[in-house]
A protein has these predicted regions:
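Acidic, glycine-rich low-complexity segments with interspersed aromatic residues
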Residues: 40-44, 132-209
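Conserved, function-critical positions that sit in or immediately flank catalytic
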Residues: 46-133, 262, 266-604
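GIY-YIG-like beta-to-alpha core
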Residues: 229-230, 486
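Aromatic/pi-system hotspot detector in well-structured domains
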Residues: 174-176, 225-226, 270, 324
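Elongated alpha-helical scaffolds
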Residues: 210-229
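Signature of Asx- and small-polar-rich beta-strand/turn repeats characteristic
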Residues: 180-213, 234-271, 356-360, 365, ...
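Short, intrinsically disordered N-terminal pre-domain segments
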Residues: 1-32, 44-48, 133, 143, ...
Length: 604
């Protein structure tokens, strides 16, 4: 079955993403999407290996694990951390170098001392394996288990509004060294399949669809123009190089139509689309992409107001022909389902066409033809003075039709806006401390419609904390970020990893400890146990040896979260909403005096 998913579908989805940010009567309406940009993963990337069916001998940090025969093993690595059902690994090696991997269900063995050492007796069966290092983050997985992990490692989230998102398109600057020639808009580009049976039409730069064409440009004043004509004629079938930078300033620009016409060189015709305002330049202009302004932008609205459905702007000479009335300037009506269109063309002494242009744009055309038979040619634009045409006269002029609605009527569709860029600025400890500044993160993403913690109510706040927190009193020393913390609790031991430690103003012993708990690193007898509001059982740091008690009397808001009996939950309900975008990155380090502008480009 022959079928395609068209670019229009992708453009539609990009439009829907942006429109969903403001739809509905209020912030909690079902029509509106509450999108949040989140950061997470404070702990370093290491290779991850699930294990099961362990024997009674434990794997040891610093020892190796391997599969097969040690001297010729297909996989071996150094143990960096040991969990109940997984290992973190470094220094991966084997028959395929760092790309070596233990097949699912492999017999895994522990070893100390390397080639001169011996097996430790520790064994297990291998499960899912994912290679990663700080320089090579793992590819995200699109499954439910991964989603649970995203929430466990989430640090904070910031609301995405329409002020932080734009449709973007590929960036093409006015630069005649990098971009000497541009494609022109045509409605009928297509590919020529390798198997035959179809002959398509390519653009000047070899693209097989308008979606892949280089047919627009941003000038030095951040004005965006679309190329309607690039000098194509029978002698230059792929067009010619541009010579003049299009601009809305000067005599070559016609404000009544929004067209800029070159008066030198190939005679390029450009359609003005919009001007990117300074704020959008700063937020959404990158080395690869440039924004389409919002519909409310004044320059865009002016362009939309000029759009005329089915108006014709370009006439191409397909075949210069011969035998037409010689050495004349001639006019003919554009035949089709529209009205008012007129083509003007000039012939030489042999009756061949030497130039052609649109005299009157007309409107309403979805197909168009230019006829040269007797009775169709005139010597004046009013089409009142007929010129006889001989029976042997031949030639061909193509009228290039605009997109539906006319040029400038639908910017996203016309410019192939199938990508959305979000630009999120994290300013210091944004959200009164929701975004800690004393740690780093390695994951960014977007979650749609998360709930407030402990509810089924959509979150609407500007920022949300994804961390658990405890108010500490009587700390013996400073806790260290990324260290493991423990507390004796009912039924066993609670474990966590420190994300942030912030002393109270003027204190050296009291502060807020923010942490994560994951199902891999923080289980006790198969269970992730919660830290308790117990002033007698201290919380202790593994590497710092810091020890402090829960301030069970504390019940105020501090650093973006609200405490009850010294404990504070995240502000995001675990596993709520839909994670629609995830990107694993190298570490991004935060600092108290630092601002990050993070750009995400989502292609639909």
């Amino acid at each position: 079955m022959a079928a395609i998913i068209s670019d229009k579908f992708r453009i539609f989805n990009a439009k829907q993403f942006l429109e969903s940010l403001t739809e509905g009567p209020n912030d909690t309406s079902a029509e509106r999407s509450r999108m949040y940009f989140f950061v997470g993963r404070p702990q370093p990337w290491k290779a991850y290996l699930e294990i099961h069916t362990k024997n009674s001998t434990a794997f040891v940090v610093g020892n190796e694990v391997y599969v097969g025969t040690y001297g010729s093993t297909a996989f071996r690595a150094t143990v960096a951390a040991v969990y109940d059902s997984a290992l973190l690994l470094t220094d991966v090696f084997g028959s395929n170098g760092v790309n070596s991997a233990p097949p699912l269900g492999s017999a895994l063995k522990g070893r100390s001392g390397g080639s001169g050492g011996s097996d430790t007796g520790a064994t297990a069966v291998s499960g899912v394996y994912r290679y990663a290092t700080e320089d090579v983050p793992p590819l995200p997985l699109d499954n439910q288990t991964e989603k649970y992990g995203l929430y466990d490692e989430m640090i904070a989230a910031k609301r995405i509004t329409d002020a932080f998102a734009r449709t973007v398109i590929r960036r093409y600057n006015w630069d005649l060294v990098a971009n000497p020639k541009f494609d022109m808009w045509k409605p009928d580009y297509s590919a020529t399949p390798g198997g035959g049976g179809q002959i398509g039409k390519q653009t000047a730069t070899g693209a097989t669809s308008i979606a892949d064409a280089k047919f627009y440009v941003m000038n030095s004043s951040y004005e965006v123009f679309k190329c309607l004509y690039n000098g194509e004629d029978p002698s230059n079938t792929t067009g010619q190089n541009a010579t003049e930078e299009p601009t809305t300033a000067g005599a070559n620009y016609a404000s009544a139509t929004g067209l800029y016409t070159e008066t030198t060189g190939a005679g390029y015709i450009w359609k003005y689309m919009y001007t990117i305002p300074t704020d959008d330049v700063l937020k959404f202009l990158s080395s690869d992409f440039m924004p389409i302004v919002l519909p409310a932008n004044a320059s865009r609205q002016a362009t939309v107001a000029l759009a005329t459905a089915g108006a014709c702007d370009v006439a191409l000479i397909e075949n210069a022909g011969s035998g037409l009335p010689a050495s004349q300037t001639l006019y003919t009506s554009i035949k089709g389902d529209g009205t008012g269109g007129i083509v003007k063309f000039v012939t030489n002494g042999a009756g061949a066409i030497t130039s052609a242009e649109i005299e009157a744009r007309g409107s309403g055309y979805t197909y168009a033809n230019v006829l040269f038979a007797n009775g169709n040619l005139f010597s004046n634009a009013a089409l009142s003075s007929a010129v006889a045409t001989g029976a042997s006269a031949v030639g061909a002029i193509e009228v290039v039709l605009p997109p539906a609605g006319g040029h400038g009527s639908d910017h996203e569709t016309e410019l192939n806006g199938k990508r959305v860029m979000t630009n999120i600025r994290l300013t210091y400890s944004e959200g009164q401390g929701d975004f800690p500044v004393d740690n780093d993160f390695r994951r960014i993403g977007i979650v749609a419609d998360p709930y407030n913690y402990g509810t089924t109510t959509f979150a609407t706040a500007d920022t949300l904390s994804g961390l658990k927190s405890v108010k500490i009193t009587g700390a013996s020393a400073d806790f260290s970020v990324d260290e493991k913390i423990t507390q004796t609790v009912t039924g066993g031991t609670a474990y966590g990893t420190v994300v942030s430690w912030t002393l109270d103003s003027g204190s050296t012993t009291a502060g807020v400890l923010k942490y994560i708990q994951t199902t891999d690193a923080h289980t006790d007898q198969g269970v992730v146990r919660a830290f308790e509001s117990n002033g007698s059982n201290a919380i202790t740091g593994e590497s710092s040896t810091a020890s402090g008690n829960v301030d069970t009397s504390y019940g105020s808001s501090l650093l973006g979260v609200t405490f009850a009996s010294g404990l504070a939950n995240p502000e995001i309900e675990n596993n709520s909403g839909n994670v629609i975008y995830v990107e694993n990155r190298r570490l991004i380090t935060r600092a108290p005096d630092q601002i990050e502008d993070i750009k995400l480009v989502i292609e639909f």
